[in-house]
Amino acid sequence: MNYQTFIFDLDGTLLDTLGDLAASVNYALRTHGMPEHSIDDVRRFVGNGVRKLMQRAVPDGESNPDFEATFATFRQHYLAHSLDTTRPYDGIPGTLEALKARGCRLAVVSNKMMAATHELCRHFFPDTIEVAIGEHEAEGIRRKPAPDTVFAALRQLRVGKEGAVYVGDSDVDIQTAANAGLPCISVLWGFRDRDFLIQHGAKTFISAPSELLL
């Protein structure tokens, strides 16, 4: 693959965050007397940011009078526990190191909270990920699938779209890449399966991180 810049999604692409997300969702629901969800439920809920995650998890979503309190409990718990079980997918650290050694530029764009995005990238990828951008709407950067985070990452890397590719695991990532005018590589080890991704327009797939080096 002859790309010089790689823009990665985080959850389900570089990191398996599902266990910690589900634990924090269920802690918040349990704390506020609401029914909990299975990990497969939470897998379906993720992808559009943590507020949307909790809208899907809380009965009646934002219409529930206890929604904001439950959402606040989730945020507090997740920021304290985002490293409990989260780990890079097999092959990710070595692949990032190999790309970096080739002179490639590497960034992360996520709908995750900015603080958690930075913490996870600093913890797991301190020497490879140059730019990490999380939820930033308060500063006028719309969340994915808007292209704003991708454009912000390219600006911070001081590179253009030429030679850049977006790598993600979801329909949101496919839409984000299209909106940013970038090719998209869909990974098959994440939170969505091949059939789902094909239904949402995926064209290029990889089954292992090392395929990015081919």
Role assignments for model-derived ranges:
Residues 1-44, 55-58:
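Active-site neighborhood of HAD-like aspartate-dependent phosphohydrolases
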Residues 25, 92-122:
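Substrate-recognition element of Asp-dependent hydrolases with the DxDx(T/V) motif
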Residues 28-29, 49-63, 153-154:
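Helix-loop "lid/cap" segments that line or gate small-molecule binding pockets
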Residues 55-94:
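Metal-dependent phosphoesterase signature
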Residues 85, 113-165, 171-175, 179-180, ...:
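Substrate-recognition "cap/lid" segment bordering the active-site pocket of phosphatases
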Residues 204-208:
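Short acidic-hydrophobic, aromatic-tinged amphipathic segments that line or gate anion-handling sites
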